[in-house]
Amino acid sequence: MKFLDEAKVYVRSGDGGPGCVSFRREKFIEFGGPNGGDGGRGGDVWVECVEGLNTLIDYRYQQHFKAKKGEHGMGSNCHGANGADTVLKVPAGTQIFSEDGETLLADLTEVGQKIRLAKGGNGGFGNAYFTTSTNRAPKHANPGQEGQEMWIWLRLKLIADAGLVGLPNAGKSTFLASVTAAKPKIADYPFTTLHPGLGVVRSDGREFVLADIPGLIEGAHEGVGLGDKFLAHVERCRVLLHLVDGTSEHAGKTYKLVRGEIEAYGNGLAEKPEIVALSKADALDADTLKSQVAKLKRAAGRAPLILSSASRKGVPEALRALQTEIDASAEAERKPVAAWQP
């Protein structure tokens, strides 16, 4: 499935149906009086968060969504039918912005959430509504109220428990493939991964969702290499697994480069728990491995995990460390906030 995390769409709710001008006509009833019914209400436009989606690709091919108009009123005081609603289905993690791209209208984070973007117009009154003591036979009715229209931006931020970060070719996709059923493209060149991906990890009888984003480069927080868009997908993660390529020239400098981009990006990303791991350990001899571990430890301020996704060395330990941080974060959210006391 192709991945799309941003789309601009046009929505319009339905116009209300016009009221009816009608008079009762029956045999032997000369002045039957007005009996025009009201018009139906226009349909609404809704956005609903549903299961089974992790991309906005459907909105690449269709950008205009219009609800149905209300039906016109009829004689015999028959009201017009209401217009059908239109529902835009989006994955969990979708944010809705106004046309300026900055005003947040809604943030849909849970399946089942549903918001109304545009309300349908009210139906017009039929001439029966305008009957008064001084005007027993009104000959006018209201037109229906116009619907609302707007352009909106849909932006997806993937919802995962843990996120993988690192430079291109750091082994993130290989790690994801080794611990989940996901099948990301893997090759020995930078930028093999072009789109974020998700996988479900099953470890020690537990499950959590792991997100893999394309590799970051210097200037990512400013949009270089679309880095700012990719970092947005790990904003909602509880913990980051920072993979540092053991075959790089200097593991410590590599770590600091990515860490600097995370801190410059902001939005609370730098405050998230981080697990540091040296990847591709199977490709290093003992002396090089020892040297790279020492450099990375000095840069990160703590001893890194040593990983090899190919041989699975250190993988179970990494998964347990991730699960521990995820549990700690979830527990912190569940703690009740003490009531304020003067």
UniProtKB/Swiss-Prot annotation:
GO biological process, one term: ribosome biogenesis
InterPro entries the UniProt entry points to: G_OBG, GTP-bd, GTP-bd_Obg/CgtA, GTP1-OBG_CS, GTP1_OBG_dom, GTP1_OBG_dom_sf, OBG_GTPase, P-loop_NTPase
Gene3D superfamilies reported for this sequence: GTP1/OBG domain, P-loop containing nucleotide triphosphate hydrolases
Gene Ontology molecular function terms on file: GTP binding; GTPase activity; magnesium ion binding
Cofactor: Mg(2+)
EC nos: 3.6.5.-
Cellular compartment(s): Cytoplasm
Domain (OBG-type G) ranges: 160-327
GO cellular component terms, semicolon-separated: cytoplasm
Chief location: cytoplasm
Keyword line: Cytoplasm, GTP-binding, Hydrolase, Magnesium, Metal-binding, Nucleotide-binding
Binding site for GTP: 166-173, 191-195, 212-215, 279-282, 308-310
Domain (Obg) ranges: 1-159
One Pfam match: GTP1_OBG
Transmembrane regions listed in the UniProt entry: none
Annotated Mg(2+) binding sites: 173, 193
PANTHER family: DEVELOPMENTALLY REGULATED GTP-BINDING PROTEIN-RELATED (PTHR11702), MITOCHONDRIAL RIBOSOME-ASSOCIATED GTPASE 2 (PTHR11702:SF31)
Protein role: An essential GTPase which binds GTP, GDP and possibly (p)ppGpp with moderate affinity, with high nucleotide exchange rates and a fairly low GTP hydrolysis rate. Plays a role in control of the cell cycle, stress response, ribosome biogenesis and in those bacteria that undergo differentiation, in morphogenesis control.
Entry similarity comment: Belongs to the TRAFAC class OBG-HflX-like GTPase superfamily. OBG GTPase family.
Subunit structure as annotated in this protein's UniProt entry: Monomer.
Name used for this protein in its record: GTPase Obg
Organism: Methylobacterium radiotolerans (strain ATCC 27329 / DSM 1819 / JCM 2831 / NBRC 15690 / NCIMB 10815 / 0-1)
Gene that this polypeptide is encoded by: obg
